[in-house]
């Protein structure tokens, strides 16, 4: 059976989503066309609107519909604290903890020389400019604890320390509610090394 080209195009478009392979994309496309055409139309409108309206904040590089995002404009925030994250999703997770009251800088990625991603690709010059504006007192590195995230944190830390800035890193350890029996040895080791007095 020859599939309609429009359906093939939809399937290929859905494959661009992370974690969606050819079979999942095909199932989604067929579901939308067979059971939820209104949902498909809404999805199309939402994607078009987001692509048209969402841009990067001129100050922190996160997603916004304005030149400067609401977080950067919030007078209640401490401009002396700058938290560096890899993605807007990481920023959202930190915001949901209600523990950080400073400002952010979103890298939109992480260093990965094997993938050809260098300092320019993660907006390092923009970060340095922001961090050395005379207002920022401390930069909190909240990159992920992957090899690339660690390399990114190290590179940024060395770069900013050389300019006289105080740089800190998120602590690592046992998750809240986690039982040691189910935590991997690397996490327990890091928690032991990063322990603090109470």
Curated annotation (Swiss-Prot):
InterPro entries: DNA_Rcmb_RecR (IPR000093), Rcmb_RecR (IPR023627), Rcmb_RecR_Znf (IPR015967), TOPRIM_dom (IPR006171), TOPRIM_RecR (IPR034137). Residues 80-175 form the Toprim domain. CDD domains: TOPRIM_recR. GO terms for biological process: DNA recombination; DNA repair. Keywords: DNA damage, DNA recombination, DNA repair, Metal-binding, Zinc, Zinc-finger. GO terms for molecular function: DNA binding; zinc ion binding. The keyword Amino-acid biosynthesis does not apply. May play a role in DNA repair. It seems to be involved in an RecBC-independent recombinational process of DNA repair. It may act with RecF and RecO. NCBIfam families: recR (TIGR00615). Belongs to the RecR family. This is Recombination protein RecR. It comes from Janthinobacterium sp. (strain Marseille) (Minibacterium massiliensis).
């Amino acid at each position: 059976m020859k599939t309609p080209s429009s359906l093939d195009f939809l399937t290929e478009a859905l494959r661009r989503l992370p974690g969606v392979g050819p079979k999942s994309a095909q199932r989604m496309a067929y579901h939308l066309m067979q059971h939820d055409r209104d949902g498909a139309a809404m999805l199309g409108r939402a994607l078009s609107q987001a692509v048209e309206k969402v841009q990067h904040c001129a100050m922190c590089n996160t997603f916004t519909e304005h030149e400067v995002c609401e977080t950067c404009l919030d007078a209640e925030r401490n401009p002396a604290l700058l938290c560096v994250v890899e993605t807007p999703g990481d920023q959202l997770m930190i915001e949901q903890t209600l523990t950080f009251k400073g400002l952010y800088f979103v890298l939109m990625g992480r260093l990965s020389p094997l993938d050809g991603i260098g300092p320019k690709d993660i907006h390092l010059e923009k970060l340095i400019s922001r961090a050395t504006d005379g207002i920022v007192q401390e930069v909190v590195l909240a990159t992920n604890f992957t090899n690339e995230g660690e390399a990114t944190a190290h590179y940024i830390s060395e770069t900013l320390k050389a300019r006289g800035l105080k740089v800190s890193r998120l602590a690592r350890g046992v998750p809240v509610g986690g039982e040691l029996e189910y935590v991997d040895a690397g996490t327990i080791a890091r928690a032991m090394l990063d322990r603090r007095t109470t």
